[in-house]
Every structure is written in C-alpha cells, then in structure tokens.
Amino acid sequence: TTLGVIDEARARKGSRMRIAVVGMGKIGLPLAVHYARGGHTVVGVDVNPRVVALINEGVEPFPGEAHLAEYLPPLASSGALRATTEYADAIPGADAVVMVVPLVVDDQSRPDFRVMDAATRSMAAHLTPGTLVSYETTLPVGTTRGRYKPLIEEVSGLVEGRDVDVVFSPERVLTGRVFADLARYPKL
C-alpha cells in the first residue's frame, strides 16, 4: 500500500491513528495531507510560524503541488490536519511520527546533520512509549540505526525495539507530483 510503515502500525493499533509529521515542507505537507485523507488525525510540526498559520487557514503555503490547494482546505477546517511550531503539541500520544526534515549537503557533498539532529532531539524529548518513528528523509546508509536510534534513546529514555520502534522508509516522491507518486509506488 502507499502508506507503508503507517499501515503496519495501523494494523497493530486499529483503523485510525494519530500521526505527527515533522517538517511541513514540499514533501512533508503532502504526506500529512495524504495521511489525513486516509482517515487519520494529523498534526504537523514546522519551525516556520508563517507556514504553520497558512496550513491552519487551509491555504497552500507553497504553490505547485498538484491537488494540494484542493485537498488542504477541507482537512484544515475539519481539524483532521493542523500544524504547530510546538513539538509538545504534536508528539506526545502520537501513534506514529514521520520525520521529513531536509538534510542539507554542503559544497563538498558532505551531509550537514544539524537541522535533523535538532529536530530529532526536540521530537525525542516528547516521545511516548508505543510510538513508531519513521525517518522518510533520504539519509546516508546506517544513519537511522547509527545516529538517530541512539539519540532518540538518550533524549527520551526509551529503548528502541521495546518502548518505541525506529525505522527508515525514505520518500520516493517528487515535488509537484507527490500524490500521484504515493498512489503509484508501494512502500515498505
């Protein structure tokens, strides 16, 4: 199915889930809309208050994504999808957290993890047992297991595999056609 790891968590939990999406940019917002259209309650986190305000008003913050201007308004007005700048408002009690924070690469093609590290720390500080954390940003091989699993455990005090599940399921979509790609490409 198109929801991948979210479907796995849903099967364990029941039909409707509370999903937090961290990073409401050109990939994160369409993913959040996709989950909300699937019947889930979604809270998005973004550091940009302007983006958060526009999403909550049902206004597309960055034009160009096919169908986003059509799908977003009814989800925002119904409360199925909302956004916040506060991790404490989105993460506690979430069944799944989807990390879609950009990973910047410097001029020598080295990844700069500072933004993702900060987002992971902020998310982990509010993580509750039973949550699935899925990294969907494209990351170097081994980063989820070697960098983010230990960081989540350190900050949250929770143990991966016992208290929380941490997975890597990179997005396979392109901006401008996210909804079509989600329907077209299966996810693990």
Where are these regions (language model features)?
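Dinucleotide-binding Rossmann-like beta1-alpha1 core, especially the glycine-rich loop
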Residues: M99, D165, R172-L188
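Alpha-helix C-terminal capping/helix-to-coil transition sites in glycosyltransferase folds
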Residues: P92-G93, P129, R184
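Rossmann-like NAD(P)(H) cofactor-binding subdomain of soluble oxidoreductases
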Residues: V105-R172
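NAD(P)+-binding Rossmann beta1-loop-alpha1 motif at the extreme N-terminus of oxidoreductases
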Residues: I6-E60
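Short, well-ordered coil/turn residues at beta-beta hairpins
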Residues: G93, M99-V101, E136-T137
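A structured beta-alpha segment of the ubiquitous adenosine-cofactor-binding alpha/beta core
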Residues: H67-D95, V105
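Short mixed-charge
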Residues: F62-S77, V155-D165
